[in-house]
């Protein structure tokens, strides 16, 4: 059936995490609307509250009164949220706290050495389970600034170092191989921190005065929007408009891929919200051409690769995603989860030299295997609905991690 709809979505998850953390130590009262309503962001709220942060829901607003944070009484449970675990490691260290971080079974398999190494170099005493959660961090002694070259492109690791650097005795410098999402840098600049960005080199100075509070309407999450966009693109004679969507250049690799395969997109009402470019974006359905994604684009579409792989399944040939090994360290081994689901749906897909290959074809009906991973679940529900108008899935509860309103939006689109 044809889709012709306009949707408004919950706020960007990455921005929501960062806004909560920085507002919790700002000098005054911050108000946030359209905060992401998923379980991951709730994990960050509960973690900050365990450290004494004042965070209250007031109607549609979340009100945060900045104050000095304190050591939590118990280990902090980050649930399924890698962003919470990695960013809080640096952020709470900047406040010279002693704390422990735990997580669910999935998060407890994800690599933490990538933050343990730089934070230890800065002066944190860290105990871990052989590089995995739980982590116990003692940052009560003075922290020193570091010069750190990132071994992998990771906004979480970069942000952990930059946030820790706020409480260091000297400046910290981070050098990236490829640009990753820069919400931490933008928000720090807008809240009064001294941070200098020169291409892929970022320097942050220790905070000499408190951060300025913010009033923020969080723009729509483009990673969440991607599922609905692809469903519309795969539906003949369809179009969808996403209102007030985040258009940060480090987050629109997904749109760039769509434009490369001649999917028509129209942007209107462009504006900035606290340094972040946003706008209303229209996407119009079209036949799908196969495509190739170069390695340097992968960091900017890492969360959208599952849904782009679904798009490729309907393509006219072989699609190649180069250097996607980082997918193996997400909420699931997403690389294998994508391949397994595509094969279940009758689409040939395989790994070759750390690249993902998808050969377009005609899907056959199957049950979606979620691997308890929200993005895998949503991506392959879209595939099933686009191909058959219905779906079966082994676990849909995991979708609440990032987008509790997913099914409501699907229902609106199809009504």
Predicted regions and their residues:
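Structural preference for solvent-exposed beta-strand-turn elements
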Residues: 1-415
